[in-house]
Amino acid sequence: MVKLSIVLTPQFLSHDQGQLTKELQQHVKSVTCPCEYLRKVINTLADHHHRGTDFGGSPWLHVIIAFPTSYKVVITLWIVYLWVSLLKTIFWSRNGHDGSTDVQQRAWRSNRRRQEGLRSICMHTKKRVSSFRGNKIGLKDVITLRRHVETKVRAKIRKRKVTTKINHHDKINGKRKTARKQKMFQRAQELRRRAEDYHKCKIPPSARKALCNWVRMAAAEHRHSSGLPYWPYLTAETLKNRMGHQPPPPTQQHSITDNSLSLKTPPECVLTPLPPSADDNLKTPPECVLTPLPPSADDNLKTPPECLLTPLPPSADDNLKTPPECLLTPLPPSADDNLKTPPECLLTPLPPSAPPSAPPSADDNLKTRAECLLHPLPPSADDNLKTPSERQLTPLPPSAPPSADDNIKTPAERLRGPLPPSADDNLKTPSERQLTPLPPSAPPSADDNIKTPAERLRGPLPPSADDNLKTPSERQLTPLPPSAPPSADDNIKTPAERLRGPLPPSADDNLKTPSERQLTPLPPSAPPSADDNIKTPAERLRGPLPPSADDNLKTPSERQLTPLPPSAPPSADDNIKTPAFHPQRMIISRHLPSVSSLPFHPQLHSQQMIISRYLLSVCGFRFHHQPMIISRHLPSVSSLPFHPQLHPQQMIISRHLPSVCGGRFHPQRMIISRHLPSVSSLPFHPQLHPQQMIISRHLPSVCGGRFHPQRMIISRHLPSVSSLPFHPQLHPQQMIISRHLPSVCGERLRGPLPPSADDNLKTPSERQLTPLPPSAPPSADDNIKTPAERLRRPLPPSADDNLKTPSERQLTPLPPSAPPSADDNIKTPAERLRGPLPPSADDNLKTPSERQLTPLPPSAPPSADDNIKTPAERLRGPLPPSADDNLKTPSERQLTPLPPSAPPSADDNIKTPAERLRGPLPPSADDNLKTPSERQLTPLPPSAPPSADDNIKTPAERLRGPLPPSADDNLKTPSERQLTPLPPSAPPSADDNIKTPAERLRGPLPPSADDNLKTPPLATQEAEAEKPRKPKRQRAAEMEPPPEPKRRRVGDVEPSRKPKRRRAADVEPSSPKPKRRRVGDVEPSRKPKRRRAADVEPSSPEPKRRRVGDVEPSRKPKRRRAADVEPSSPEPKRRRLS
C-alpha cells in the first residue's frame, strides 16, 4: 500500500479556491488513481476551507492518500487540534465559533438548507451568492463574521460565568445575590444587550428576511397543526420551499426563542399572530385578542354574547327593534326566527296566582312559573313567528280557590292547550282565540273547575275564505241588548253560548270578522245578584253580532267610538262591576319598575292595551286576572313586540292619566307613556291608516273618562316617536296629532249622527265624535244599562261614505251658548262641539283651518255644573283636515296668538292650562310631516278673569269657533293671522304658577322631513313679537342683500382705501368743490366712494347717512357698478401700497 502525505501549509491554504484546486491537482498528477476520488478530496477541502485562517500555532493538517492496491485509494483525514474543524464548524480560538445558535447563524443556515437552487444575498458582505452545493461562502465572509460576533461571544461567555457563579453561590447559601453580585449581574446583562444591539445593527435587511421567513413559516406550521388558518404573511419563497420539502415544523424554542433575545423579544408577541377572519367584523372580544375562537359558519350573532363587551354585528333587518333584554342573553339561532320571538320566550308573564289565602302547594310553586317564564317554545319550520306567543299569552279566566287536584291540571289546560290552525286562518284568527276573555265563572265545583273554562277558551270560530282583516272589528264592538236577570242554571251555560256560539261567516265578510266577534260588547245587565256576579260581564263582552255583506272597513270604528252619556251615581252593587277591568285589557303603569319585561302578545289588538303614565289610585280596583301593567321608567319597554298588524285606531299612548281610580276603561285600549324613551321601537303595523292614530300630549283627569277602546294617542315628547314605522302609504289626513286633550273625565261626546249617501270616508270619524244629548237623571237600573247602550249601538254605514267628509263636519264650531243652566249642563256644549256643518264644493284647502282657529266670543259666566263638562266638550272636538291642505296651512293656524288672559284664580290653577293645551287640529291627506307640529303648537288665547264656572268653558269657546273660509283664500292668509302678536298678559297670580310655564314650555314645533333647518326658528321669531315689525323687517330684508356685498367688497377694497384717501387729500387743495359737483353729476360713480366712506365710519358717518337717504332708490345699480369697478382700481392701489 502506497501512502502519499500532502502537507498543507498556511501559505498554501492562503490561496483562493481555484488556486488550491490547481495546486492539489499538480501534486497528485503523478499518482495513478481514478480522478473521481481525487476530485472528491479536493472538493471536500475546497468546500470547508476558509482563506486567511489563523491557526494559532497549531499543527498543520495532514492529508494522507493511501493506495492499498492498484486502482484503489484510501483517503484519511487527520484533524490534529479538535477546536479547528474545516468540515462543519468555523473556528474556536480568538475567532472561534462557540456553537451557539444565534439569529444570524440560524438565518444563514436556513437559507443554505432550505433555499437550495435560489439566489440570495450574503448577510455580512451583502454579496449575491448561490446556495448550490460545492460553492459556499468564502473566507472573507467568515472573517467579517468573526469580527461581528467577537463582542457578543465574549459578553455571552462572561454572562455564563457570572450566572453560574451566582447560581452556585445561591444554591449553597440559600440566599439571593449580594449587592456586589447583583451589580456584576446587571453589568453582564448590559454587556449582553449591547452585544445584541451591535449584532442586530450589523444584520442587513436581506439577512433579516431569511429569519423572518423562517419565523413566519414556523408560526404557520404551528397554526396549521392546530387547525387554524394559515399565516397570511408567508413569502412566496418560503411557501415554495415549504410546499416542496414539507420539513417537520420546528419547535418554537429552537426556531424562535433564544437566550440572547429572551429579554428583548418576547416570544408571545412575535410568534403568536392572531388569525385573520374574513367574517370577523366586530365580534372578536377585546379580552380574547390573543385567544382566537374557532369560527362557525352558522354562528353569526350568538357566539359573542357570551362575552359581555362583544358588540353585536349590525343586521339589515334589525332597525330599532332589537330588545335590550336580548343583548346580554344569547338565544339559540333559528332560521325563521324573527326578532320578536326571543322577547316572547324570555319575558312570558305568569298567570295570576290563586288568592293568597289559599295554601300553596309544592307542585304549583314550580310548574306554573317555570312554564310561563323560563320555558321557551321550540320553533317549528312552518310555524309563524306569532304561533308560540299566541299560546303563551292566552288569558285564562280567574279560577276558583285552588284545590289539590286543580293545582296542576287547570292552569295547564288553560295555558297549554293550543288551538288547531286552519288553512284559511288569517293572522288575526289566533289572536281572536287567544285573547277572548272568559266571563267569571260561578263558584266552581269539582267538575266545573276544568270543563267550563276550556269550553270558553278553546271554542274557535270557523274562519271564512273571504274574511277580510277588518271585518272582525265590526263584530267585536257590536253591542248586545242587556240580558235578563240570570238564573242558577244560566250561570254557566249562558256565557258559553254567547261567547262560543260562532256566527256563520258570509262570503263577503271583510277581514274584521273575527275581531268583531271578539270584542263585541254586551249591554250591562240588571243589578247584579250573587249569581250574576260572573255572568253579566260575559254577556256584555261576548255576544257577537252577525256582520253584514256591505260593511265597509270603517264601520267598526263608527261603532267603537260612540260615546256614552254619564252614568248615574254608583250604587253598592255597582261597586264591583263598574271598576272591573275588561279581561282583555292591558295597563302599563309608570311606577311599576319590574313590569318592563312583560312580553305583549305580538297579535294583541292594540285596542286591548293601555300603557299609562299615572295610575295613582289603582289599589282599589279589582283588576282582571290578565291585566298587564308596564312602568313608565322601564327602559326596556321598547322591546315590547306589539303586533305588526295593529290598527292604530286601537292604540292610545297618553302622557297623563292621573286619577284612573274612578275610570271605566274599555278593555281594548292602549295607552303608552310619554317618557318611555324606547317607545319608538314599537313595531306598529306598516299598513296602519294614519287617520286612526291620535297622538296627544296631555290627558290629565281621566278619573271620570270613558275612553273608547279603538283610539291611539301618542305622546308629544317621546323623542323617538319619529322612528315609529308607520305605513309608507299612510294618508296624512288620517293622522291626528293633538297637543291638548285635558279633562277626559267629564266627556260625554259620543252621540253618532246618521251618515248621508255622499259622506266621504271620514263618516265613521263623524260618528265617533258625535256628542249625544244628555240623558235623563239616571235611575238605579240605568246605572249599568244606559252607558252600554250608548257605547255599543253602531250606526249603519252608507255605501258612498268617503273618508274625509266627516272631518269637515266634526270640527265645525258652534256659536257660544247662553249662560248655562242646570239642564244645559250636558246638552249645550255637545251641541256646540258636535254639530258638523255640511262642507261646500268650492271650499279651498284652508277652509277647515280657517274655521278651526277662529276665536269665539267668550261665553256667559259658567255655572257650578258647567265646571266639569265644558272642557271635555271643548277638548275633544278635533278639527277635520282637508284633502288638499298644504304643509304650511297648519303652521299658519297654529301660531295664531290669542289675547292675554285675566289673572288666574285658584280654580284656574289646574284646569285652564289643560284647556289651552288640548285643542288638537286634524291633519289633511296631503299634509307633510310638519302638519301635526304646526297644529300642536297652536297657541290659545288667554281667558278672561276666570270665575268658578268659567274655569273651563270660556277658553273652549274661543278655541273652537272657526270662521267659514273663502274660496280664494291663499295658503299664506293664515300665516298672516297666525303671527299677530298678543297684548301682554296680566300679572301672574299664585294659581298661574303652573299654567304659564306649561304654555311657554310646551310649544315645541316637531321637525318634518321637508322642513329646512331654518324654517322653525323663523316661524318662532315671527310668532313671538315681530308682527308690528313686519314692515320694518321687509325694509330690512330689502336692505339686507346690499350690505352683504358691501361687506365683501369692503374686505376686498380695505387695503386700497387708504391710498384713495391719500389721493383725495392730494387733490383736495386743488379743487374739492368741483369734486363734490362731479360726484353729484355722476351718481353711479359716487356710490363706490360713499360705500368706502361707509366702510370708514370714523371719517365721516354723518354725510354718509345724509347721502344714503338721498340716493336710496338708485343704490342697488350703483353698488353693482361699484362692484364692477372695484376690482380694477383696488388691485393697482394694492400694488402701489405694497
Curated annotation (Swiss-Prot):
GO cellular component: membrane
InterPro entries according to UniProt: NPB13-like_MII_rpt, NPIP, NPIP_N
Sequence ranges of Basic and acidic residues compositional bias: 406-416, 448-458, 490-500, 532-542, 782-792, 824-834, 866-876, 908-918, 950-960, 992-1002
Keyword Transmembrane helix belongs to the record: yes
Polar residues: bias regions: 252-263
Biased composition (Pro residues): 349-359
Region (Disordered): 242-578, 747-1138
Subcellular location: Membrane
Top-level taxon: Eukaryota
Transmembrane segments: 73-93
Pfam families linked: NPB13-l_MII_rpt (PF20885), NPIP (PF06409)
Membrane topology of this protein: Single-pass membrane protein
UniProt KW keywords: Membrane, Transmembrane, Transmembrane helix
The keyword Transmembrane helix appears for this protein: yes
Family to which the UniProt record says this protein belongs: Belongs to the NPIP family.
Name of this chain's protein: Nuclear pore complex-interacting protein family member B13
